[in-house]
UniProtKB/Swiss-Prot annotation:
It is found in: Cell inner membrane. InterPro entries: NADH_UbQ_OxRdtase_chain4L/K, NUOK/Mnh_C1-like. This is NADH-quinone oxidoreductase subunit K. NDH-1 is composed of 14 different subunits. Subunits NuoA, H, J, K, L, M, N constitute the membrane sector of the complex. It is a multi-pass membrane protein.
Length: 101
């Protein structure tokens, strides 16, 4: 049987993997976006786990709102990435310094 501890451990492992992805690979925009999405997924796992434990469906409802925001974030991030690649011919974050004043 899957307990609350198992679900929280899974959420913690996913969150740690996403943090490692963000801190170890800061130059590739695609890896950064994937790590942020994985971080949101780990939060969703924790919401569902607590919602199941407490018998309250509001946590599961909140997951749908998070998924909606995550989908919008991914769409906007990929649109920025495509525009960046078309103008600079790179997706390396270190080479994009056009906003520096």
């Amino acid at each position: 049987m899957i307990t609350l501890g198992h679900m929280l451990a899974l959420g913690a492992v996913l969150f740690a993997i996403s943090l490692a992805g963000i801190f170890l690979n800061r130059k590739n925009v695609i890896v950064l976006l994937m790590s942020i999405e994985l971080m949101l997924l780990s939060v969703n796992v924790n919401f569902v786990a607590f919602s199941r434990q407490l018998g309250d469906p509001s946590g599961q409802l909140f997951v749908f709102f998070i998924l909606t925001v995550a989908a919008a974030e991914a769409a906007i991030g990929l649109a920025i990435l495509v525009t960046l690649f078309r103008t600079r011919r790179t997706i390396n974050v270190g080479e994009v310094d056009s906003l520096k004043g």
